[in-house]
Design a protein with these regions (language model features):
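N-terminal cationic and glycine-rich segments that engage phosphates or anionic surfaces
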Residues: 173, 213-217, 308-311, 322-324
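Long, well-ordered amphipathic alpha-helical subdomains in the mid-to-C-terminal portions
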Residues: 291-320
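Phosphate-binding/switch region of NTP-binding enzymes
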Residues: 182-302
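Conserved catalytic network of the ASCE P-loop NTPase/AAA+ motor domain
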Residues: 61-65, 91-95, 118-124, 151-155, ...
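Conserved inter-motif catalytic segment of the P-loop NTP-binding fold
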Residues: 75, 87, 92-184, 189-193, ...
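Terminal-proximal interaction/regulatory segments of ATP-powered molecular machines
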Residues: 310-365
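The Walker A/P-loop phosphate-binding site
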Residues: 2-128
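Residue-level signature of catalytic and energy-coupling elements of molecular machines
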Residues: 53, 72, 113, 163, ...
Length: 365
C-alpha cells in the first residue's frame, strides 16, 4: 500500500498583515523576515591600518565593526589605551566618517594629536569629517547629563570615543558634602539605563576603561580580584573587549633607554569573530603604535619577510635586527608599499572595505 502523501501546510493567509497590525497596535516596529534582504544584520568593518589588530577584530572583514560597542581596558596604566583609540579615530576619519572624542578626563592635548598624525584641519569641503573634541573646562559634567548627550551623539556621529568610564560620576556624588558616603553602584545603574534608551544608535562607541580592586573579595591565593569600573553593563553590551597588557621594552641598543613597548592586545570578548586571539603591537613613545612594525611582524608570521639569524630580508632589501628593518621601512616608501600589498593580498577583504568609501592611500601611516 503506497504511503499517504503528507499535505503541506503553509502559513495562514494574511499572516504578515496580521503580525504588522498587532505590532503596530502595541507601538512596536514592523517585523522583517530573515529571508529578505535585511542589510542591518550585515557587519561592515573599517580597517584600522594595523593588519594584526584588524585580524583579531574580524578575521574575515579585517577591521573594526561599525555600529558596535568596543571596550578597551588594562590592568596597568600607561599601556596605550588612549593612543590605540586614536588609531581607531584616525581610521574612521580617513574613511570619511564622522568622529567625536569625548575627553572626560580632560587630559588630551592638541600637540599629541598632531604627533600621532591626526588631521586637525580638514581639507576643503571636508569639515564634517573633522574630529570633534568634547570637553567641559569648568567642572565635571554629571553622568546623567553626559549620557543624555551621548545618546544624541550616537544618532549623528559614526564613532564616539569615551575617555574614560572611570572619570564619570553621578550628580549626587558630585554635590555631596565632605565625609558623606558615596552612592554605591550608581554609575552601573546609569549605564544600564543608557543602553536601554540607546537602542536606535548607529554609531560605534569605543569605551576606554580602567580596572579597580573588588572591595571585600579575595581569591584563594590571597590576591585581590580586579574588575572594570561602571558595573557589568558595558561588559555585556559590548561586542568586542580588548585587554592591553605589557610584554617588553623596545630599545635601540641593549643598554640604551627604552623608546617604546611591546603591547599585547587580547580579545577577551568578540561577538562578530572568534575570540581569545591576541596581537603583539609596538608602541613607540611620542608617535603612537607603529604601523611599520605591525606590517613587519605580520610579514614575518606569513613568511613574506625572511629571517636568517639576526638578519631580515625582503627582495633586495636587508637589515640586521627588527628595529633596523623597521627604520628601513620608514625611510623607503617603496619597500613599505610592497610589503603592505603582500600582507594585505590582492584578494584580501581589505580591498572590499576600500570600495565602501575609503581609498588605498588612506591605509598609509
Amino acid at each position: 500500500m503506497p504511503p499517504k502523501k503528507v499535505k503541506e501546510v503553509g502559513p495562514p493567509p494574511g499572516l504578515d498583515a496580521s503580525l504588522n497590525s498587532e505590532l503596530s497596535a502595541a507601538g512596536c516596529m514592523n517585523y522583517v523576515k530573515l529571508a529578505e534582504d535585511f542589510c542591518d544584520m550585515d557587519v561592515i568593518c573599517v580597517p584600522t591600518g594595523f593588519p594584526q589588530l584588524d585580524y583579531i577584530l574580524h578575521d574575515k572583514l579585517r577591521g573594526c565593526p561599525r555600529g558596535r560597542d568596543v571596550e578597551i581596558y588594562s590592568k596597568e596604566p600607561e599601556l596605550g589605551k588612549t593612543t590605540i583609540s586614536l588609531a581607531f579615530l584616525k581610521a574612521f576619519q580617513k574613511a570619511r566618517l564622522r568622529t567625536c572624542y569625548d575627553d572626560v578626563e580632560r587630559t588630551m592635548t592638541l600637540q599629541y594629536l598632531k604627533d600621532l598624525g591626526m588631521q586637525i584641519r580638514p581639507e576643503e569641503n571636508m569639515e564634517q569629517y573633522a574630529i570633534r573634541l568634547m570637553r567641559h573646562e569648568d567642572s565635571v559634567i554629571p553622568a546623567e547629563v553626559w549620557l543624555d548627550t551621548l545618546i544624541k551623539l550616537c544618532g549623528i556621529m559614526d564613532l564616539v570615543v569615551v575617555d574614560s568610564v572611570a572619570a564619570l560620576e553621578k550628580k549626587a556624588n558630585l554635590e555631596k558634602k565632605p565625609g558623606e558616603p558615596n552612592q554605591v553602584g550608581g554609575l552601573s545603574l546609569l549605564l544600564s539605563e543608557f543602553y536601554r534608551k540607546n537602542v536606535a544608535k548607529k554609531a560605534t562607541i569605543l569605551w576606554i576603561n580602567q580596572m579597580r580592586t573588588k572591595i571585600g573579595q579575595y581569591s584563594p591565593n590571597g590576591s585581590v580580584p580586579l574588575d572594570t569600573t561602571g558595573g557589568k553593563a558595558i561588559k555585556f553590551y559590548s561586542s568586542i573587549r580588548l585587554e592591553l597588557s605589557y610584554v617588553d621594552k623596545i630599545r635601540e641598543t641593549k643598554d640604551g633607554d627604552p623608546i617604546g613597548m611591546k603591547i599585547k592586545v587580547f580579545t577577551s570578548k568578540n561577538k562578530v569573530a572568534p575570540q581569545f586571539r591576541q596581537a603583539i603591537m609596538s608602541y613607540i613613545f611620542g608617535t603612537g603604535f607603529s604601523q611599520h612594525f605591525d606590517y613587519m611582524d605580520a610579514g614575518l608570521k606569513n613568511e613574506i619577510i625572511t629571517k636568517k639569524g639576526s638578519w631580515l630580508s625582503f627582495g633586495n632589501w636587508k637589515a640586521q635586527g627588527p628595529l633596523n628593518f623597521h627604520n628601513l621601512m620608514r625611510e623607503d616608501a617603496e619597500l613599505f608599499k610592497e610589503i603592505r600589498i603582500m600582507v594585505d593580498g590582492e584578494d584580501s577583504v581589505v580591498a572590499e572595505n576600500v570600495s565602501q568609501g575609503t581609498k588605498p592611500e588612506d591605509f598609509e601611516e
